[in-house]
């Protein structure tokens, strides 16, 4: 099913007990990011993939000052807020709501959940960090209460400095997220098979085979 801004796939939202919100990267599409679900243990999940206008959630680097990426950043965060409200309205509880993003989508996912920290089902960030020319702790509130988070990144990465990944991990841990950060030397700006395996095991709790 597709509406103006979101593709909905997987189990019917009104019947599912769990939901995964999947956020594409710059230049990507909702349909692209949904294909990742085939590699993850989410067969019983409702899958929701929002589509960014112009295939980008905000125009400049995530390391630009927040003001430079306005009003697009606020609009994108609001799009996620409305999507989360829709999932909650379907009767799915926060501890069964998961977020996943790649690159710009990983940055947006991390920014959104950290501004609205709760005991979510889990968060997967394939190459991303909190948004801004620096980290603004005053923007973040709530308590993750042990939410499992996996952050994977290459080093070096052309878009996401590993130092920002480390700083993001530290802040989320201070907000009581159970963060696993894994740095892959020379991986490039992509998603590796090991990242998929780590996310499956650590966040989606798939049994080890």
Label each PLM-derived region with a short phrase.
Residues 1-96:
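Serine-hydrolase catalytic machinery in alpha/beta-hydrolase-like enzymes
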Residues 26, 166-209:
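C-terminal catalytic histidine-bearing segment of alpha/beta-hydrolase fold enzymes
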Residues 33-36, 136-137, 161-171:
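Short alpha-helix in the alpha/beta-hydrolase fold that links the catalytic acid
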Residues 35, 111-115:
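Active-site signature of alpha/beta-hydrolase-fold catalytic machinery across serine-
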Residues 99-101, 126, 152:
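Short beta-strand immediately N-terminal to the catalytic nucleophile in serine-hydrolase-like folds
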Residues 100-105, 109:
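Gly/Ala-rich beta-loop-alpha elbow adjacent to hydrolase catalytic centers
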Residues 118-131:
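A conserved short beta-strand
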Residues 150-153, 157:
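Short beta-strand/loop motif that positions the catalytic acidic residue
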């Amino acid at each position: 099913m597709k509406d103006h801004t979101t593709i909905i796939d997987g189990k019917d939202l009104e019947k599912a007990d769990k939901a995964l919100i999947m956020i594409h990267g710059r230049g990507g599409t909702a349909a692209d990011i949904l294909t990742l679900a085939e590699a993850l243990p989410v067969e019983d999940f409702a899958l929701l993939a929002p589509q960014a206008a112009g295939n980008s959630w905000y125009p400049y680097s995530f390391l630009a000052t927040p003001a430079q990426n306005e009003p697009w950043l606020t609009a994108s965060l609001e799009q996620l807020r409305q999507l989360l409200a829709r999932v909650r309205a379907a009767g799915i509880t926060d501890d069964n709501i998961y977020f996943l993003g790649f690159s710009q989508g990983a940055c947006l996912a991390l920014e959104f959940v950290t501004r609205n920290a709760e005991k979510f089902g889990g968060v997967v960030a394939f190459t991303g960090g909190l948004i801004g020319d620096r980290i603004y702790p005053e923007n973040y509130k709530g308590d993750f209460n042990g939410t499992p988070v996996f952050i994977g990144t290459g080093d070096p990465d052309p878009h996401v400095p590993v130092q920002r990944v480390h700083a993001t991990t530290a802040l989320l841990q201070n907000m009581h997220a159970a963060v696993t950060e894994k740095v892959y030397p020379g991986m490039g700006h992509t998603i590796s098979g090991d990242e998929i395996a780590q996310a499956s095991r650590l966040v989606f709790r798939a049994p080890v085979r």
